[in-house]
Amino acid sequence: MRPELSQYKHLSAGKVREIYEIDDKHILMVASDRISAYDFILDTEIPDKGRVLTAMSQFFFDTIDFPNHLAGPADDPRIPEEVLGRAMVCKKLNMLPFECVVRGYLTGSGLVEYKQTSSVCGVELPEGLVESSQLPEPIFTPATKADIGDHDINVSFDVVEERLGEARANQLRDASIAIYKAAAEIARERGVILADTKFEFGIDEDGTLVLGDEVLTPDSSRYWPLEGYEAGSVQPSFDKQFVRNWLTGPKSGWDKDSGLEPPALPGSVVEATRERYIEAYELISGQKFCQWIGSCV
């Protein structure tokens, strides 16, 4: 259910977030407990998910040395009490039309493409890689942004260059890989593998490239436990892959290619997903989720 914030104008709704206008330079970004999978927004929500996403984004925005769109603290007085802990005050940006995906490990759609072409988004990879193989170096594999219900489409770097120009495309690629490497090092020090992630960038009024949207959350990233990692099999995860696996498993009775809406998640899957999201936040940030604003009340 969308929060009714009478003091602000509602601008748009995404799969997970609601955007409100604060003034001509700032927006309020509110993370709901909705969860999406296979381009569907599920009927079942995950309690506290929006707070975890906001807490995780806040942690990395504060930690990673790169311009970002945050324009106030987590307890900014411009955030209404009813969404405190799941909302951020952000600068308005001219968002760039690409999902900036960085992969350090081979899995998901990247693995499917690799098996067909020995490459991912035009990036040639060595022979012999298997599910969950670590790549020699992280690779930039952009995708076009899709409307709700449509698939993001993986594209080659040439497409980004054609759309944005060589200089901006190079800046986008280099920034994405640098941020991924910094975050992956932080995660690894805490016993977690950052397998891949996606970023969104925008341009501010000064022409500066700025990191926007959410960043390095369990929604936008694949996180695996370092302990027990072994290439060649699907890894346990701290992200929504758990939901994807249940939906495509025998217990759901659902075929993702059927065109039908997915079923409701059972309580056990909801609680296990909530626990995984919270565990990811606590492991990587080193902070207790109960200490985050609006949690454990």
From Swiss-Prot:
GO molecular-function term, one example from the UniProt record: ATP binding
GO BP, one annotated term: 'de novo' IMP biosynthetic process
EC number: 6.3.2.6
Gene3D superfamilies: ATP-grasp fold, B domain (3.30.470.20), Phosphorylase Kinase, domain 1 (3.30.200.20)
Keywords: ATP-binding, Ligase, Nucleotide-binding, Purine biosynthesis
Signal peptide: none
Recorded metabolic or biological pathway in which this protein acts: Purine metabolism; IMP biosynthesis via de novo pathway; 5-amino-1-(5-phospho-D-ribosyl)imidazole-4-carboxamide from 5-amino-1-(5-phospho-D-ribosyl)imidazole-4-carboxylate: step 1/2
Record GO cellular component, one term: cytoplasm
Reactions accelerated catalytically: 5-amino-1-(5-phospho-D-ribosyl)imidazole-4-carboxylate + L-aspartate + ATP = (2S)-2-[5-amino-1-(5-phospho-beta-D-ribosyl)imidazole-4-carboxamido]succinate + ADP + phosphate + 2 H(+)
Highest taxon above the source species: Bacteria
Family matches, as PROSITE patterns: SAICAR_SYNTHETASE_1, SAICAR_SYNTHETASE_2
Family according to the record: Belongs to the SAICAR synthetase family.
UniProt xrefs under NCBIfam families: PRK13961.1, purC
Protein name according to UniProt: Phosphoribosylaminoimidazole-succinocarboxamide synthase
UniProt organism field: Corynebacterium glutamicum (strain R)
